[in-house]
Amino acid sequence: MPVDPEKLAKLQKSSAKKVGGSRVKAKKNIKTEQDDTKLIEALGKLKATKIEGVEEANFFREDGKVLHFNRVGVQGAPASNTFAFTGYPQEKNITQLIPQILPQLGAENLEILRQLAEQIQAGKTPKDFNTGSANAAADAGGEDIPDLVDQKFDDVE
């Protein structure tokens, strides 16, 4: 095997500087279990218990998206008003979940769902819809509430 004298001289020159071979820095493994243990400890301090029978959970966001947990674990501490939902969420549009949600809703929620469907068709964001309905409800509800400014409570009928 022919050896190039220039390469050999270059290698000998650089070998005087090197003590060891090239080292690849090992990647640091970040364990997510540590975060879970902290969560479990915090829930243990609150005396949270596992709630059975919850098959799925949906969290409605202000931007119209829904966080859907298909297989969910629920732990709750009602005394401290704390509930933990664990699992892998899927971000979906509300239109994808309407067939699954309809049987679970009561009569009072169907009106809200109808308004939400109209609002989606109109192209508004749910945030705009919520502020508009809150303002309309405040205006409509203000008719039967008397003004009590600069009056005594006993004088107002």
UniProtKB/Swiss-Prot annotation:
InterPro entries from the UniProt entry: BTF3, NAC_A/B_dom_sf, Nas_poly-pep-assoc_cplx_dom
One Gene Ontology term from the biological process aspect of the record: protein transport
Compartment list: Cytoplasm; Nucleus
GO cellular component: cytosol; nascent polypeptide-associated complex; nucleus
Chief location category: cytoplasm
CDD domains documented for this protein: NAC_BTF3
Region Disordered: start-end pairs: 1-28, 124-157
Pfam families in the record: NAC
Domain NAC-A/B: 33-98
Tagged with keyword Ubl conjugation: no
Keywords: Cytoplasm, Nucleus, Protein transport, Repressor, Transcription, Transcription regulation, Transport
Family: Belongs to the NAC-beta family.
Subunit structure: Part of the nascent polypeptide-associated complex (NAC), consisting of EGD2 and EGD1. NAC associates with ribosomes via EGD1.
Primary role: Component of the nascent polypeptide-associated complex (NAC), a dynamic component of the ribosomal exit tunnel, protecting the emerging polypeptides from interaction with other cytoplasmic proteins to ensure appropriate nascent protein targeting. The NAC complex also promotes mitochondrial protein import by enhancing productive ribosome interactions with the outer mitochondrial membrane and blocks the inappropriate interaction of ribosomes translating non-secretory nascent polypeptides with translocation sites in the membrane of the endoplasmic reticulum.
Protein name per its UniProtKB record: Nascent polypeptide-associated complex subunit beta
Organism encoding this protein: Candida albicans (strain SC5314 / ATCC MYA-2876)
